[in-house]
Amino acid sequence: SVGDDRQVIIETLSRELRTNDIVIVTGGLGPTKDDIIKAALAHLPGTDTYRTDERQLKIVHDILSSRGLDILDINLAQASVPDTCEVIPNRLGTAPIMVFRFDEEKFGHPATLYSLPGVPFEALGALPDIISDIKSHFPISDIFHKTIMTYGIAESALAKMIEEWEDNLPSDMHLAY
């Protein structure tokens, strides 16, 4: 959890993006002045410019109209997103789901940040889209598990015995013992 301090948010997210390929944050996307995460996210890529996401704008209109609520400028501002993000429409609420992709120049490796609404059912509702996006951008090879039972030999002796074989395994294959 990070407080509502723009600089602390920027520093925390920068630190996390330097050490992780994927960072997922929730909250701070609402229409009120204390919701400052969007401004911090806009700053990360080095730009503070915004655009209106027309799909999210329509969702804002549809949700508020269906509830019989007045559509205020403050509500419409929720469809305003940093220029550098991709938007996954949030069909469950008015706050957009934003995706920021950074090349290795920015944080030393490619990194992706997902910003989800803080309303729990909206964040949970976004997970299928987020997981699909992660799978398409971060292909994961199959995980194969094989259990081999040994007895009568210490772990260190076994490690020494198979050391040369283990050192020659493909780079994406690892042993755990």
How should each PLM-predicted stretch be described?
Residues 25-33, 117:
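Glycine-rich beta-strand-to-loop/alpha-helix junction loops that act as flexible
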Residues 7-14, 79, 160:
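Short, contiguous clusters of charged residues that form electrostatic/catalytic patches at enzyme active sites
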Residues 2, 12-15, 19, 25-27:
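Helix-rich terminal scaffold detector
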Residues 106, 111-177:
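An accessory alpha-helical subdomain
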Residues 20-23, 48, 172:
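Secondary-structure boundary/capping positions in well-ordered alpha/beta enzyme cores
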Residues 18, 35-138:
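Proline/glycine-rich low-complexity loops and linkers
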Residues 7, 95, 156:
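A short acidic, often aromatic-flanked loop/helix-cap motif at beta-alpha or helix-coil junctions
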Residues 1-7:
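Short beta->alpha junction loops
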